[in-house]
């Protein structure tokens, strides 16, 4: 029997292709968080659901289902605090996530923010756009001259 897979947001084509190898895929085109009715429907009518951060699978959602057919909430993201894992497990639904999926991106953003603070790039960009740039350097600090966290 073919698994019915519900993906709650449009995801990269690589994800959709991989999911398509595992079963019949339905993709919800709306990019906003699902409402309660949609979440209940997903648990009742699909075997696997790929929710994202805004889809709050609470105890109330599980309790509102007549019969839960879903066996897996495969969360597309690292955090899963929007899913009541204990209640999901009590209903025979396993919960997974993608640990490490955003580690590189998080490090990139941290570096960008540190550089922006040291080099004052946001401030400098506003000054340039306002045609108020003067010969005074806004970029004299560097990361090697700074100490972070103590």
Where do the PLM segments sit?
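Hydrophobic alpha-helical segments, chiefly the membrane-spanning helices
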Residues: 149-150
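An N-terminal-biased, well-structured beta-alpha scaffold segment characteristic
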Residues: 1-96
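Phosphate-binding beta-alpha-beta segment of Rossmann-like dinucleotide-binding domains, i.e.
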Residues: 91, 99-141, 146
């Amino acid at each position: 029997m073919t698994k019915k897979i519900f993906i709650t947001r449009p995801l990269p084509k690589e994800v959709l292709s991989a999911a398509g190898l595992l079963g019949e895929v339905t993709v919800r085109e709306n990019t906003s968080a699902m409402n309660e009715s949609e979440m209940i429907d997903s648990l009742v009518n699909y075997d696997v659901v790929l929710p994202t951060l805004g889809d709050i699978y609470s105890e109330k959602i599980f309790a509102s289902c007549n019969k839960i057919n879903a066996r897996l909430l495969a969360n597309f993201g690292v955090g899963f605090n929007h899913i009541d894992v204990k209640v999901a497990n009590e209903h025979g639904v396993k919960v997974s996530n993608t640990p490490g999926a955003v580690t590189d991106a998080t490090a990139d953003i941290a570096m960008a923010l540190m550089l922006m603070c040291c080099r004052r790039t946001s401030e400098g960009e506003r000054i340039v756009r306002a045609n108020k740039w003067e010969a005074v350097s806004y970029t004299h600090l560097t990361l090697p001259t700074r100490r972070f966290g103590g």
